[in-house]
Amino acid sequence: SKFKHPIYGDELETFKMYQNREPRFYVNVFWSGMTWHGANKKTANVQFYFNGNSGPGKSHNYPPTGYLAHKFTNPSIDTSTGNYGYLDFPVFRYAEILLNYVEALNEYDPSNADITLYLNMIRKRAGVPDIEEVYPDAAGDQTRMRELIRRERQVELCFENLRYFDTRTWMTAETDNNMPVYGMNISAKDHKANGEFWQRVICKYDGGR
C-alpha cells in the first residue's frame, strides 16, 4: 500500500509491516524500495533483490539481510561537489547514562519511582508513550522491568556497538546471540508485492560456534 516516510516525506509502495512503527525505526532502518538521500544528490530508489541496483547480482557491496543501518547517515552529503559532510559519533550518550542508571536501580530498588521517570525521558525524546502507558503492569515488577529496560536499550542504542557487550554483561549471549540471522530473500528476481524477496529466510547461522 502507499506509504509516506515520516522522516523524509518520500511516498512509496510498501508493506504494512513498515507502517506505523515507532519513530526510531525510521531513523535507524533502511529497507528495499526506499530512497537513499545524499551521496551525489541523485536520490535513487534502492533495490536489494538479486539484479537490483544494490543487489548481489550487480554489486559486491550489498546487505545479506536486505536491510541497511540508517543511523548516523547525513542526507546533506554531496560527493559530486566534495561535500562529504560531518557527523559526531557519540562516545558516551546521555541516553546510555540514563539506561545504565535505571538498570542498576531496578536491581537495587525495583519500586523506586526514578526508574520510570528517567526511562520515560528517553522515550519522550524518541516520541513514544511513557512505559507505564504501554505496560501498566511493569512498574514495581523487577523481572518485567528488567526485560523492558533491556529492550529499550536494544532499540535506543542500536548500531552503536554496544549490544555485543550488553549480552555478555547480562550473561545472555549464549541464547541471545546463538540464533539464526533472518532477513529478506535477496536471491529473488524482483521485490514486487507478494514476491519471493519478501519471504523471510535464514541469512546466516553457524550452529552457535
Residues covered by each model-derived region:
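Intrinsically disordered, low-complexity segments enriched in glycine/proline and serine/threonine
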Residues: 74, 99, 106, 199-202, ...
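Boundary/linker segments of alpha-helical solenoid repeat arrays
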Residues: 129-133
